[in-house]
UniProtKB/Swiss-Prot annotation:
Protein name per the record: BTB/POZ domain-containing protein At1g21780
UniProt-listed CDD domains: BTB_POZ_ZBTB_KLHL-like
Pathway where this protein functions: Protein modification; protein ubiquitination
Keyword Cell wall biogenesis/degradation: no
Organism for this UniProt entry: Arabidopsis thaliana
């Protein structure tokens, strides 16, 4: 029948019924809102009963909808009347989950609207329902991604750069505003009467061009995991030198992930140099609690010749605490 079709636009679905006539039940064709196909149905007994329910499918079974919506029934004609339901918020699975009884009888042509105010997916195994439509968090994520793409282009294409960085083996272009926002040290360079402010140049002679590019990629938000992993020791030094605390913390976490016998002494030295307490404890635990000190017997003499005396004292105290007789 022609009057079983439901028209949709955005979050509104409208079912125009040309003639309900003497029949006591009518069901609409499926219509899609969100990720589900829906049906409306009407039935006349003592009341006009309007039902909203999802089409039985794998999607509605595995990802049942939690819908917040309003129903409205109106007749067509000069004496138009509107009947508006309460705002429902329900988990909808079957035809009986939402039944709205309208205390009026409609004859001839009338319209049923359903306006979805919100739609969420209810986890079958419990937990918090997840929204189908964009939320503030979603829009924030989209905005962040767009901003990062713009920053990436600014760096890669040298768009309106205003500072030159001289590294050990080449030069790079950057933006004073980005550097200043990321580092109090860079900010001080450009806000006081220092050489960097006058010449619009920065000398970072203790970093290669490749490592410095990794630093800029981090500050501009487009560094890759591979790039970070490759240059993390150089990045750690730069983070400490230029007071980039979040980068310093990220480097420490990364260096904690792959401590082994071939790098533990080097990591311990880095931890002491840059005051990385978590990394230092991790290295000492690896050496003494787990007994890996025996695996570095050949390297330990050279390490002790170069190590800071306070670090050596701390290592000795760690030995005493681990091997303390019961």
């Amino acid at each position: 029948m022609g009057d079983t079709k439901v028209e949709t636009i955005s979050r509104l679905a409208q079912w125009r019924i040309e003639n309900f006539g003497p029949c006591s039940f009518k069901k609409s064709d499926p219509f899609k809102v969100g990720i589900w196909n829906w049906h409306l149905s009407i039935e006349r007994n003592r009341y006009l009963s309007v039902r909203l329910f999802p089409e039985l499918s794998r999607v509605s079974k595995e990802q049942p909808p939690v819908a917040k919506f309003v129903l409205r029934v109106s007749n067509v004609g000069p004496n138009r009347r509107f009947y508006i339901s309460p705002v429902y918020e329900k988990l909808l699975r079957t035809t009986d989950d939402c039944v709205w009884h309208v205390d009026s009888s409609f004859h001839g042509r009338f319209t049923i609207d359903v306006e979805f105010l919100d739609l969420k997916i209810c986890p079958v195994n419990g937990g918090e329902a997840s929204p189908v439509w964009p939320t503030d968090a979603t829009m924030q994520s989209i905005s962040t991604q767009t901003t990062l793409k713009c920053l990436s282009r600014m760096l890669e294409e040298s768009i309106l750069t205003d500072v030159i960085i001289h590294t050990a083996d080449g030069t790079l272009s950057a933006h004073k505003a980005i550097l200043s926002a990321s580092s109090t040290v860079f900010k001080s360079m450009f806000h006081h009467d220092l050489m960097e402010k006058e010449s619009s140049t920065i000398h970072i002679d203790d970093m290669s061009r490749e490592s410095c590019m990794a630093l800029l990629s981090y500050l501009y938000g487009n560094i890759t995991q591979e790039e970070f992993w490759k240059h993390r020791l150089a990045l750690l030094g730069a983070a400490n030198k230029y007071d980039i605390t979040d980068l310093k913390a990220a480097c420490e976490e990364s260096l904690m992930e792959d401590i082994n016998s071939s790098n533990v002494l080097e990591r311990l030295q880095e931890a002491w140099l840059y005051q990385l307490e978590k990394l230092k404890k991790g290295c000492l635990m690896y050496l003494f609690d787990f007994g890996k000190i025996y695996d570095v017997r050949e390297e330990i003499s050279s390490f002790f010749r170069q190590a800071d005396r306070e670090l050596m004292l701390e290592m000795f105290q760690e030995v005493l605490s681990v091997w303390k007789p019961v």
